[in-house]
């Protein structure tokens, strides 16, 4: 739980019209040191470490990606490729990018521009595995076999910059539009981009609610986002009663 709490406390959580949870000028931000200290203490146990060193940027494994970036396996009908300014600027994200393959897969999965990029790489996974995908950073090229790339359920192996909530007022059926904000950067070109991946899941809603409530119980900090989520949760028809502490114990 401490590990999940740490992850949730470092990312930017927003609710509907961008209500910030943590920022440098907020009371919440001052509590991060306590949270980090708890995580450091937790990781002294024999439990395998699930996070990169706290004060260091993540070291990516080129052969491991989250399922958010897994390209579609089905070939789509070919249509025209729209060469827009945005499409051209995306090429700057790829040129000499140390994370070229990861960035390419993110663009292919981008809900806002996926049709264009799927047309550009139409059905590439249906080719012979011997063909593979070759990325080149300056004169350094590497060939990848798509079937050998490992996709994991842990979204945080990618550069997740935050989460975004748009929770519906309609509680007749569960709908919680949770978006993962993926940060892309090409340091060689000074280009950045944020891609939003919608991910609707009651389990994820419960997990985040548990983490925020645990943080509240441990620190006494009042969180606006927690109040909104608890209000919404209490109105769901399939919640028989409001939990006194956590929705789930695990």
Curated annotation (Swiss-Prot):
* Membrane-topology descriptor: Peripheral membrane protein
- What species is given as this protein's source? Human herpesvirus 6A (strain Uganda-1102)
- Biological function: The heterodimer glycoprotein H-glycoprotein L is required for the fusion of viral and plasma membranes leading to virus entry into the host cell. Acts as a functional inhibitor of gH and maintains gH in an inhibited form. Upon binding to host integrins, gL dissociates from gH leading to activation of the viral fusion glycoproteins gB and gH.
Q: Which family does it belong to?
A: Belongs to the herpesviridae glycoprotein L (gL) family. Betaherpesvirinae gL subfamily.
Subcellular location(s) of the protein: Virion membrane; Host cell membrane; Host Golgi apparatus, Host trans-Golgi network
> Per UniProt, which keywords does this protein have?
Disulfide bond, Fusion of virus membrane with host cell membrane, Fusion of virus membrane with host membrane, Glycoprotein, Host cell membrane, Host Golgi apparatus, Host membrane, Membrane, Signal, Viral envelope protein, Viral penetration into host cytoplasm, Virion, Virus entry into host cell
Quaternary structure, per UniProt, is: Interacts with glycoprotein H (gH); this interaction is necessary for the correct processing and cell surface expression of gH. Part of a gH-gL-gO complex.
- UniProt-recorded name of the protein: Envelope glycoprotein L
Signal peptide start-end = 1-18
Please list the disulfide bridges.
136-141
In this record, what's one Pfam family?
Answer: Cytomega_gL
Entries under PROSITE patterns matching the protein: GL_BHV
Q: Which GO terms describe its cellular component?
A: host cell Golgi apparatus; host cell plasma membrane; membrane; viral envelope; virion membrane
Which GO biological-process labels does this protein carry? Answer: fusion of virus membrane with host plasma membrane; symbiont entry into host cell
Ranges in coiled-coil conformation: none
